[in-house]
Amino acid sequence: MKVERFDPETDGTSVRACHEIYLSGLPDDDPLGPPMSPRVFAGWLALGWTEDPLETWLARDDSGEPCGWYLLNLPQRENRHRASLELTVHAARRRAGRGTTLLRHAAGRAAQAGRTVLEGQAGEGSPGAAFASTLKARSPGTGVRRVLPLDRPPAGRQAAARAEAESAARAYTLRTWVGPAPEDAVAGVAAVNGALADAPRAPGEEEQVWDVARVRGDERRVAAMGLRAHVIVAQAATTGDLAALTQVCVDPAMPEWGFQELTAVARPHRGHRLGLLLKLAMLDLLAAKEPQLTRIITGNDVGNDHMIAINDQLGFDVLDRWPWWELDVADVPADLAARA
């Protein structure tokens, strides 16, 4: 098997091969969730979910056929001791040592970059989770995905939640936009995003520090993937300060799905049910602007009790569980070719 690095921004053939391999594994790896469309997948390989440098490697078997790939994310601002790994082998070519070879190759690259921990996620009960267990990887936490079916909202539940939220948040006004934040709001968005530091995270994982440049970079990645990003913020009526925000993205290639991204409330403004208010307002906005939506998917750490309670109040149903896995790079025998 030969493993070669490629540039997803210029090598569309390799990107398509990786997407086909990804799709082949979905019945086992992620049977319940929405697949990434070709444009979103290509944008992810090229740009990632964050601004950090990426390495994308494609494996070919002895006949030259693509059989697996991995994406290595190397954080540069925080968590410089860690590397995030996404690794997939074609469903028809599994259980033949290819995944182990790719893991060793990735570990070698991570070590060369000075990283000591590899991290990744695999659905509960999936081949990836079994592989991680075989490697004796640690599981420091678990994400839980939930789905809100928009065609059958829980009777009376959202109306009661709306009355509660509106009563508690009378000192705030709402503002909406699609796409990048207006110039007069982007600094406030960065400040509110900083509240994510309070969300549960793995031991030893450093919190992200948000600034305007990081917000703008995130917006550029969303635009490059062709996603429509609907944003609602709450502002303090007396000062105009941004107090909370929520964002839902829609992929035109999969118009029935809404992807709930971050929801955050700045510390000084907590206790006014702003998270609940914004999510209810977003449902109203999507009903008007994206009437084709049939469901919204979201994910939370299993320990994020507050946001889970809000999602339960709105009628989200548990879809599946995705443990995080960590492995010390030193525990993976590195592929010498990865150091070349």
Question: What are these model-derived regions, one by one?
Answer:
Residues L45-L58, G68, R220-I232:
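A short helix-loop-beta-strand connector motif used in the catalytic cores of GNAT acetyltransferases and
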Residues R60, S84-R95, Q235, L262-G271:
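A short, internal acetyl-CoA/4′-phosphopantetheine-binding micro-motif in the GNAT/acyltransferase core
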Residues Q76, R95, L103-E183, W322-L327:
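Acyl-donor-binding surface of acyltransferase catalytic domains
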Residues R95-G108, S133-T134, V265, G271-D284:
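Conserved acetyl-CoA-binding loop-helix of GNAT-fold acetyltransferases
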Residues M1-L47, E51-D52, R60, A161-A213, ...:
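Short amphipathic alpha-helix that is part of the acyltransferase structural core
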Residues T56-L58, E65-L74, S84-E86, V231-V233, ...:
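Conserved beta-strand in the GNAT
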Residues A91-R94, E119-A129, A266-R270, R295-I308, ...:
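Conserved beta-strand-loop-alpha-helix junction that forms the acyl-donor binding cleft
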Residues R82, A110-G123, L286-G299:
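Conserved GNAT acetyl-CoA-binding A-motif
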